[in-house]
Amino acid sequence: MTTGFSVAVAGASGYAGGEILRLLLAHPAYTAGRLRIGVLTAGSNAGSSLIEHHPNLTPLADHKLQPTDSTLLRGHDVVFLALPHGSSAKIAEELGPQTLIIDCGADFRLTDAAAWERYYGSKHAGSWPYGLPELPGGRDALHGTKRVAVPGCYPTAALLALSPAVTAGLVEPSVTVVAVSGTTGAGRAPKAELLASEVMGSARAYNIAGAHRHTPEIAQGLKHPSGGPVSVSFTPVLIPMPRGILATCTAPTTASLSEIRDAYEDAYRTEEFIHVLPEGHLPTTKAVVGSNAVHIGLAVDPDAGVLVAVAAIDNLVKGTAGAAIQSMNLALGWPEADGLSIVGVAP
């Protein structure tokens, strides 16, 4: 087991960076004095105090935000990158191979260079082990790694909702995902469409019909036994709440609900963070807020011949920062659940 190490967070003034720090402060390695929180960086917020942006992080009140520069990040054992998409590749290249780098952006998620260039409009930087250990083979790829690509928040919910059925061949390789998300999923940069007066009392679909950048990531993570690609229709919807994603996923099936439930229970039996709810129960976002938990409800529509799988996550925890901490634990050989809760904050 690795002991005595320092952690840096680039992009610490944003929602993801702040949530990483919140989870680190509760991590057993930090409370035991084996984890030291080092340099914290920001872009336009460099020079300000962390506490100005995250007043909940009072143990770190004396930390000033530094400019995001690889020279300041060097020398840390672990570096979390919570930066805008396209910003991580250059910094990662400048850090040494012995640094554990955990990227919360999209730079290294996609394996298909053409898909990256289509959706992100820049040169593909490559791919890293994907930080979703609950997928088939995912955990093995993270043990001892020095590089992690944290999944997107929507793909996390959709993949965990669908993977057991798709992998077992219980559904056709064509899925539909309609997912509602809170406003923190759009980041902290000021945008007119995220003003309270625009969001409150309204719901808005956006980047529909294959336009959302998470569409190829969902397709990439689904493995059908036919060996062919899985087509994905993805519709994201912004709703007026700060945290949470509820993904309602459907796929054609001739299987019974009993067969499908057996596949999910087999896939997730030993997964601490995933809870397949009892038959007839459906997840709610408020039950998982603040936790790394995933709640999944299952049903089969016999008239339409489709599986309906519904997953709820906290987009800032299991959808970002929690996955980053979980991946760090695996990479360092620590207990996977260290610093992470399965208990949400309710009401």
UniProtKB/Swiss-Prot annotation:
The gene is argC. GO terms for biological process: L-arginine biosynthetic process. It comes from the Bacteria. It catalyses: N-acetyl-L-glutamate 5-semialdehyde + phosphate + NADP(+) = N-acetyl-L-glutamyl 5-phosphate + NADPH + H(+). This is N-acetyl-gamma-glutamyl-phosphate reductase. Its main location: cytoplasm. Keywords: Amino-acid biosynthesis, Arginine biosynthesis, Cytoplasm, NADP, Oxidoreductase. Signal peptide: none annotated. InterPro entries: AGPR_AS (IPR023013), AGPR_type-1 (IPR000706), NAD(P)-bd_dom_sf (IPR036291), NAGSA_dehydrogenase (IPR050085), Semialdehyde_DH_NAD-bd (IPR000534). GO terms for cellular component: cytoplasm. GO terms for molecular function: N-acetyl-gamma-glutamyl-phosphate reductase activity; NAD binding; NADP+ binding. It comes from Mycobacteroides abscessus (strain ATCC 19977 / DSM 44196 / CCUG 20993 / CIP 104536 / JCM 13569 / NCTC 13031 / TMC 1543 / L948) (Mycobacterium abscessus). Belongs to the NAGSA dehydrogenase family. Type 1 subfamily. HAMAP family: ArgC_type1.
